[in-house]
Amino acid sequence: MLKLIAPTIMLLPLTWLSKKHMIWINTTTHSLIISIIPLLFFNQINNNLFSYSLSFSSDPLTTPLLMLTTWLLPLTIMASQRHLSNEPLSRKKLYLSMLISLQISLIMTFTATELIMFYIFFEATLIPTLVIITRWGNQPERLNAGTYFLFYTLVGSLPLLIALIHTHNTLGSLNILLLTLTAQELPNSWANNLMWLAYTMAFMVKMPLYGLHLWLPKAHVEAPIAGSMMLAAVLLKLGGYGMMRLMLILNPLTKHMAYPFLALSLWGMIMTSSISLRQTDLKSLIAYSSISHMALVVAAILIQTPWSFTGAVVLMIAHGLTSSLLFCLANSNYERTHSRIMILSQGLQTLLPLMALWWLLASLANLALPPTINLLGELSVLVTTFSWSNTTLLLTGSNMLITALYSLYMFTTTQWGPLTHHITNMKPSFTRENILMFMHLSPILLLSLNPDIITGFTS
């Protein structure tokens, strides 16, 4: 794992030692080279030889998420150039350092084999994200959003620490591999039920589950572009990853404890999709659509079949790329119109035809049109929820319909219609932006040719 962690850490001195005109080029090219390294983890003859150490290891569940994390750093750097154009050099370097340190803590979270180390890095991801939101957000409300984000996540994850200490005292180890091999079946008791809640609540807040989701729209709307991209694409996936890892230890409690949360996630999926239909703020709409997609992932993980785990991993990767792309497009609109309100940026297709094409492709990917991997993920989850209970087909089917409605509503409102009067001086789309959109879309389409890469450890 050092071959991935060490080059990422070396991005920090590279950032601070780069000259003014080279800072973007150096960080982008080096982070792109680093994003190739996780591809090596697929070619493992024997898992123990290459990727396992006492502290960090990778497996087919970790590797797709590592690919997503490393792929997104160069994209966030490319997306942030315009946002930081008026900042002094030291602030640019600090911003990039925050993004790099966030990536380091994410890589270590995904690869940690000790659960206490996993918990420490899981919490460490909060600090750079909080600094990015509260320092570089656009509106004064960013401080309120940062407070919501911090306290929701901390309150959710403190019981997890207590549960981990309890597990260590009873079993004598917190190594994930040892626990999965030696885990005993937990008897159904009040204490064990509370421990199950403590284990899963931290991840349900992070996902977020409907009812615990209030921090997410605030954080998304107030965050700068890189904050929104990392939050939607990778930080929400920490919740899914943690749940999948720890569900193996908590059997068979999940079977009867999961019912209320399954019902809540399926209900929340419909609710947040419906809320998206009534949004006027573009970033808020994308944030609520994220909650809706992650509710499907929660449902899939709680059902606990190999097919549902596969669907959850595919949907997490697909959603990470799609939501990041949508935030990039929303940011390109915001940089030109200086407004997130959709009605004020309508009719942009006549001025930016190529950007309208990216909008169309992103909207179609969001509503899971073939041949995107979003369709594979949604169909897998839909089939598993149907096999768990036939009545869920009504909910998941209507959710797919509402998703199509708000995706097309978002596209038509921003691209069609008459131009508004305040749009007088509009810059054309830059090559940097077009490359950025292409680099988001190409994995979504290419992974559908070989989805084995991202189907997780159950394939």
From Swiss-Prot:
GO terms for biological process: aerobic respiration; electron transport coupled proton transport; mitochondrial electron transport, NADH to ubiquinone; mitochondrial respiratory chain complex I assembly. It catalyses: a ubiquinone + NADH + 5 H(+)(in) = a ubiquinol + NAD(+) + 4 H(+)(out). Disulfide bonds: none annotated. The keyword Transcription does not apply. InterPro entries: NADH4_N (IPR000260), NADH_Q_OxRdtase_chainM/4 (IPR010227), NADH_UbQ_OxRdtase (IPR003918), ND/Mrp_TM (IPR001750). It comes from the Eukaryota. Its EC number is 7.1.1.2. Pfam families: Oxidored_q5_N, Proton_antipo_M. It is an enzyme of class 7 (translocase). GO terms for cellular component: mitochondrial inner membrane; respiratory chain complex I. GO terms for molecular function: NADH dehydrogenase (ubiquinone) activity; ubiquinone binding. The chain crosses the membrane at residues 22-42, 60-80, 94-112, 113-133, 145-165, 196-216, 224-244, 257-277, 284-303, 308-330, 351-371, 391-411, 435-455. It is a multi-pass membrane protein. It is found in: Mitochondrion inner membrane. Keywords: Electron transport, Membrane, Mitochondrion, Mitochondrion inner membrane, NAD, Respiratory chain, Translocase, Transmembrane, Transmembrane helix, Transport, Ubiquinone. Core subunit of respiratory chain NADH dehydrogenase (Complex I) which is composed of 45 different subunits. Core subunit of the mitochondrial membrane respiratory chain NADH dehydrogenase (Complex I) which catalyzes electron transfer from NADH through the respiratory chain, using ubiquinone as an electron acceptor. Essential for the catalytic activity and assembly of complex I. Belongs to the complex I subunit 4 family. This is NADH-ubiquinone oxidoreductase chain 4.
